[in-house]
């Protein structure tokens, strides 16, 4: 009887180990699939030189590299595409989608595959041309460093000072952003209460939101627009 009991315990341990191993493999595959998909989407973008406006000092314009996004090609994959976001300091470089609610793209990738990585998505209450006073973008805090997981680096004020630039590429304009603050707020904070039917030429504030270590808290970056480049007219509007 003793030997039978020992065998049963051994078999139980093997079964538990097997189940855990399968789950780990599934998680690893999900991370891999998500990373692979978003890496392949970068075939739809290319780096292009952008000239900064001349400074008042008469110095030569600064050389800058921007992105040219194939919105037409990407929308053949997913018609919910509204923008592309880049934060060079932390490697964020993803398409931005907008669903009919704030639930679907939590667990669906750009190609609408079920995946815990989800997508970077615009709040469904915002206008897709980014003309609300406050615009909110959401992304997961992934353990593999993807999506919005590295937003937490901006809790370091020195890092934020040295890497405070972000970019939102829209079909007709590019928004140059300055990251001004990194905060932890309640998921029920008033910042998530968007005003209805209030539009403007460009947002007064763009919020990037991700999960925090506490289930009822969120980590956010506050961003302000410093430049608006209208692509069709090449008009450059700098914000003071």
Where are these regions (language model features)?
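Solvent-exposed, non-transmembrane regions of membrane-associated and secreted proteins
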Residues: 17-240
């Amino acid at each position: 009887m003793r030997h039978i009991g020992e065998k049963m315990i051994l078999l139980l341990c093997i079964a538990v180990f097997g189940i855990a191993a399968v789950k780990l493999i599934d998680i690893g595959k999900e991370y891999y699939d998500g990373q692979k998909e978003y890496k392949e989407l970068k075939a739809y973008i290319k780096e292009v030189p952008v000239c900064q406006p001349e400074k008042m000092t008469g110095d030569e314009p600064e050389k800058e590299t921007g992105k040219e996004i194939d919105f037409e090609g990407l929308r053949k994959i997913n018609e919910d595409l509204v923008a592309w976001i880049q934060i060079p300091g932390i490697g964020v470089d993803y398409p931005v989608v907008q669903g009919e609610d704030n639930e679907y793209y939590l667990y669906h990738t750009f190609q609408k595959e079920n995946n815990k990585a989800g997508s970077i998505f615009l709040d469904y209450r915002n206008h897709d041309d980014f003309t609300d006073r406050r615009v909110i973008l959401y992304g997961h805090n992934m353990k593999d460093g993807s999506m919005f997981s590295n937003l937490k680096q901006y809790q370091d004020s020195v890092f934020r000072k040295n890497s405070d630039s972000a970019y939102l590429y829209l079909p007709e304009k590019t928004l140059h952003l300055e990251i001004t603050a990194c905060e932890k707020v309640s998921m029920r904070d008033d910042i998530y209460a968007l005003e209805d039917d209030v539009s403007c030429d460009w947002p007064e504030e763009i919020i990037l939101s991700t999960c925090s270590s506490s289930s009822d808290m969120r980590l956010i970056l506050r961003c302000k627009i410093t430049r608006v480049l209208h692509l069709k007219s090449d008009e450059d509007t700098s914000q003071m």
